Amino acid sequence: MRNALGLLLACVVSAAVIAGVWYFAFSPQAILSSAPATVKAAQADRLPASAKSADDVPVTAAISGKPAAPQPAAPPAGPAVAAAVQPAAAPCANPDALGVSRVVEVDTTGGPGFGFEHFKQLDFLADKEVVLTFDDGPWPGNTPAVLKALADQCTKAVFFPIGKHASYHPEILKQVLAAGHTVGSHTWSHANLNSKKITDQQAKDEIEKGFSAVKMALGTAPAPFFRFPELQHGPASVTYLEQRNVAIFSCDLDSFDYKKNNTPAKEIETVMGGLTKLGKGIILMHDFQKHTAEALPELLRRLKAGGYKIVQMKPKGTLETLAEYDDMVQKDGKVPVSSARPVASVVQTVSQ
């Protein structure tokens, strides 16, 4: 009898324990109290999808030329739709190319001056560093030949086109920009802005109309880079450019490629001889000149052989042209309002 009662009591206790466990594990209150943990976990699982990938690192150098500070590594990103990115530049096909040693970004605030012919303050080039610059283009035959020579050596330059020439040959100037070169301005008509015959207003017109013509030819804003024709710096014009936050370019070394007795060989010796004396510098040439187009391939090879390195100069921002001069250039009728079309796409020979 006692054994039966003990067995019955044990069964009752076991049933009570099982019922208690079931209640606390599966009751509605218990289920609700555990739900927030599940929601938080789901939110945490979504975070990596919006986080930056560890591959998202800066690709441009700082204004001073020093590399940008490394950013802290971000957690790996989850699956996401990639944003559109600019295609990477094509690799250089010439293993012995001169190339570009470094790219510097110029803050043009206040109109800084470059080139020791006129400006001594900003000595940013190291020994054996040179900047290639070309004036007076664009011009058929010569400018494309200059572009090819630069492309063959995978190197870059700064171009200062004349506004009128830009309006005559916008398709060539577009090629300059498309090749990755920097495009500034060299006035509208190559007027001497330091002449006593030119007024301050006329000098302003030359400057602004030149920039507007370059903008209209390119279809985009030019760099706030300017070079005076004949390197004739009128004081009032210098002040005006400073107020417009336009960098003013002189040079360190003139190739004198515009002289009547110039030849490709003479031009090369002038440049290389000047670099031997100076050790570095901003070189002034003209893509308008045939001899420069002919000399450039060998000159670039000589620069490479001599251990010289190319520095590319780019502006921190672009120049906002003035509407009145944009209208003035547009009314001249020389610059196409829409994008330029190749002649072959407009006029074709159908019989001969």
Predicted segments, located by residue:
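N-terminal pre-catalytic segment of deacetylase/amide-hydrolase enzymes
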Residues: R2-L132, W139-A145, D152, K266, ...
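Active-site beta->alpha N-cap acidic-glycine motif
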Residues: P91-D200, E206-K215, T220-A223
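Active-site-proximal beta-strand/loop segments in catalytic clefts of secreted hydrolases
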Residues: F134-G137, F160-K164, T187-W188, R227-L231, ...
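Alpha-helical scaffold elements lining the catalytic groove of polysaccharide deacetylases
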Residues: N142, A191-L218, Q232-G279
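A short acidic, amphipathic alpha-helical/loop segment
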Residues: A145-V146, E171-I172, S237-Y240, A295-L299
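Residue-level detector of anion-binding/catalytic polar loops
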Residues: K156, T182, A247, D254, ...
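Short low-complexity, flexible loop/linker segments enriched in glycine and/or proline
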Residues: L173-V176, I198-Q201, P264-K266, Y325-V329
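Catalytic grooves of carbohydrate-active enzymes
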Residues: V271, T276-K314
